[in-house]
Amino acid sequence: MNATLVVMAAGIGSRFGGGIKQLAPVGPNGEIIMDYSIYDAKEAGFNKVVFIIRHDLEKDFKEIIGDRVKKYIDVDYAFQDLNDLPEGFECPKERSKPWGTGQALLSVKGIVNEPFVVINADDYYGKEGFKVIYDYMANKMDKNSKKLDLCMAGFVLKNTLSDNGGVTRGVCKADANNKLADVTETFEIELKDGVLNAVDENGNKRDVNLDDIVSMNMWGLTPEFLDILEEGFPKFLGNMTNELKNEYLLPSVIDEAIKADKISVEVLKSHDKWFGVTYKEDKEIVVNSIRALVDKGVYPDKIFD
């Protein structure tokens, strides 16, 4: 089965001072986090990668990543642009914040015509997520279902925390058939002195459990889902409460599409430990974690020649 890895790499981390965070070297030979994702995706069966980037990143991105990776896997690019809006809408002059992961993914419409997995550029997901998503899409996806049959990798919350501050996660609830029933964006999740704290979007305390399943934006999708994204974008733009900051977010679109009976999403559990550079101080932990995986033989010392 042809399948594509879509890497959302257009965002610059507002909290991670200095440099584009997804380009920070973490491997023994200067590898970056997404090198390991590409390696794991290819090993699982994905045979193409599409990077979603910004036009101003293109030159550096191709030099640092694309040209090196294209010897190993087919590479293509899509561009997220603030001004890429449906007819009748204009970007407010003062807005500098990208429109969010939903708009980012819309940029691959017409470029990706096969099942795909979408990930964040700056998250390390481990091998299991790619394997279970590829296997589901190749062997279990119901192509005749009235609803689009999609899937996601669900991570265990305790495997996705940062030692250096609070994180935002989509806390997931599955139904009796292991289909995603609800995704709730939850903020400032932090384990401090043995106490797990979190708040909802209004800043009110929210109860979460270390064993909750969370989304790390690793979704197994099909080109038809992009039609749902496209349909929802003008509605989002028309209902914004803050035109400088509101974002069209993938988990929210998926949550709405589930509740509207347009899609079903199989929750595929991954037991791998996530890590990423949410905070500058996380980098050392990531470097040490990658080193440990190389020492264990999970990865070769040098993954791309």
Where are these regions (language model features)?
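Hydrophobic packing residues within well-ordered alpha-helices of enzyme cores
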Residues: F61-I65, I133, V286
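Short beta-strand-to-loop acidic/aromatic patch adjacent to the donor-nucleotide binding site
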Residues: E114-Y124
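Short phosphate-binding loop-to-helix
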Residues: V69-E114
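Conserved core of the sugar-phosphate nucleotidyltransferase
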Residues: K127-W219, P223
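A C-terminal functional module that forms or caps the active site or interfaces directly
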Residues: E230-I263
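N-terminal glycine-rich phosphate-binding loop and ensuing alpha1 helix
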Residues: M1-G66, I73-V75, Q80
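A short, conserved beta-strand element in the Rossmann-like catalytic core
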Residues: G13, Y124-G126
